[in-house]
Amino acid sequence: YKVVAVTIDKLEHRKRYQVWRYDPYHYCLAILVERYVLWLNSKNRVGDVMAESRGGKEDRRLKDSFSRLYQQGTDFIEPAQFGRALTSKELKVKPKQNNITGLQIADLIAHPIYKEMTGRLLDTNSRNIFGTKVYQILQESKLIKGPRGQIEGWGLKWLP
C-alpha cells in the first residue's frame, strides 16, 4: 500500500481565504484524490477510493463532491485522468463497524502523521516516540513520492 496524507490548518485557511471555495473536508478529499490519481497514472495503474462513513447527509455531500471531481476534474487534473486512474466514478463509503482493512490502517496512521507534520511545520514539541517511529516507517517506504523523490506536496500535503 501507499499513503497520501493531507492536513489543513482551518484557522490559517480562514485568515487567508475569506470565502471558502470548498468545505474543508471536501477540499482535503480533492487534494488526496489529485495526488492519488497522479500517482496511479505515473505507475500506469488503476485504483479505487473509499472513505469512512460520517453519517447520512455528510456521506451524500462527500459522494457528490467526489462525483464532481470525477466529472469536472480540478484546476490541475483533467477529468480524463480521473477516468483512466479510478475504477469507479463513485466514492465508496463504509461504516467503521465494517472493519475495512484500509480504513483501519488509515485510522492508525493518521494521528502520527498529523503530530509529525504539526511538530515539524508549527515547531511544537508534541511528538511521541511511537508516533515518530510509525512516521519514519511511512516516510521510508509508504508515502507517495513525486517524480524527483520528494514527499512534501505528494505523500504529505499541508494546506493553509
Predicted regions and their residues:
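Phosphate-ester processing/binding pockets and catalytic centers
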Residues: 1-160
